[in-house]
Every structure is written in C-alpha cells, then in structure tokens.
C-alpha cells in the first residue's frame, strides 16, 4: 500500500473518530489495527466506563471459516490471533451499544454479531464478503458522518455511505455486501436521551 493510499485511509479514520466523538453522550472506541491480539481488543472494551453508551469501530482483517451455514466469522489482529464468538462470550463482560466491524467477512455468518448482541450490544454491522480497504475507509467515514445526527438510523447511515462510496469511486459493489445484525432502526444519536 503506497503512502498516498495510507494517508487517505488514516484521514477517513480521523474523520470517523471526530464524528463519533461529536456525539457527546457516547464513549467511542476506534481500533485501526491497534490491538495486538484478540484479547487486547476485548480488554480495551472491558476497560471502558460501563455506565456510558459505547460505539465501537474496528478496522482490521477478518474472515470466515466453515462451509455453507456451518461456519464462523472472525476478526484478525496483528499477532495473527482471531476473535471468534466463543472468545467474545468468554472474555467480554459488559454491555455496549453498537459495533461496526469493518473487516472482510465479519458478518458472513451471524455468530460473531449475535454474540456481541448477547453481551448487550444493540446492533452489529459487518460485511458478508471481501471489502477493499479504501472503500471501507470511505464507507465508515460517511456512515458516522450521517449517523452522528439526531434520529438517523444506522440503516439510513448505511444507505448514505453506500452512495458516497459509489459517488467517489464509481463502484460500491464490495461495501453493499453488508449486514446489520440486531436493531437496524438503532440511532447512534437519539433526541430522547
């Protein structure tokens, strides 16, 4: 990856960070391949204030193991460790609000997303196929730009982000292969809080 592309990706991550931070009643976690391992990532989530609403964006590698309906999605970290549903179930000990799993195949199977929901998250967003890193970066920047406004659902933010990727790159065929597991009408910023 050349320096220009890397700079573009980092700029989009900074934008997403600023958008999430502008929702003043929310604690945001952005993990752009910062966690060394799957356990480090969960430890980071567990160390956050349990009384605050959490929005998590992870930009990492991911994948899926299995065949047809018998499989698992995972997130992968620097040390090569993979976060599967069983580790989330064992290690994560608090509830959240929304997790955006910006990684290939992070929602090919529902198991990982459902485990985050079982741990108290209201919705999980992921991709059902491979996604280009640059498109993903543009997608999550546009997603959180739209989603930070009052009473915008994550479905509306997703639709907006898909159009922004199409407008900028002429194709959004990778980022439209996404899935919301849980409450697709969830708002990141609601007027009734």
Curated annotation (Swiss-Prot):
Q: Which domain of life is it from?
A: Archaea
Query: Which InterPro entries does the annotation name?
Result: Gingipain (IPR001769)
Source taxonomy lineage?
Answer: Archaea, Methanobacteriati, Methanobacteriota, Archaeoglobi, Archaeoglobales
> Which Pfam families does UniProt cross-reference here?
Peptidase_C25
Instruction: Please identify the protein, giving its name as recorded.
Output: Uncharacterized protein AF_1758
- An example molecular function term from Gene Ontology annotations: cysteine-type peptidase activity
UniProt GO BP = proteolysis
């Amino acid at each position: 990856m050349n320096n220009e592309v890397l700079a573009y990706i980092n700029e989009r991550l900074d934008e997403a960070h600023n958008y999430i931070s502008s929702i003043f009643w929310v604690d945001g976690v952005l993990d752009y391949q910062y966690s060394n391992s799957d356990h480090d990532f969960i430890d980071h989530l567990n160390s956050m204030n349990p009384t605050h609403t959490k929005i998590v964006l992870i930009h990492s590698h991911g994948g899926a193991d299995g065949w047809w309906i018998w499989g698992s999605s995972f997130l992968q970290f620097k040390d090569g460790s993979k976060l599967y549903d069983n580790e989330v179930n064992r290690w994560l000990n608090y509830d959240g609000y929304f997790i955006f799993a910006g990684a290939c195949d992070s929602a090919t199977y529902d198991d990982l997303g459902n485990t985050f929901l079982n741990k108290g998250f209201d919705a999980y967003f992921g991709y059902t196929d491979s996604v280009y890193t640059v498109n993903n970066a543009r997608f999550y920047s546009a997603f959180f730009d739209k989603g930070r406004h009052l009473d915008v659902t994550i479905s509306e933010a997703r639709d907006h982000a898909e159009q922004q990727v199409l407008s900028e790159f002429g194709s959004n065929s990778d980022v439209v292969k996404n899935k919301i597991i849980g409450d697709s009408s969830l708002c990141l910023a609601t007027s009734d809080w």
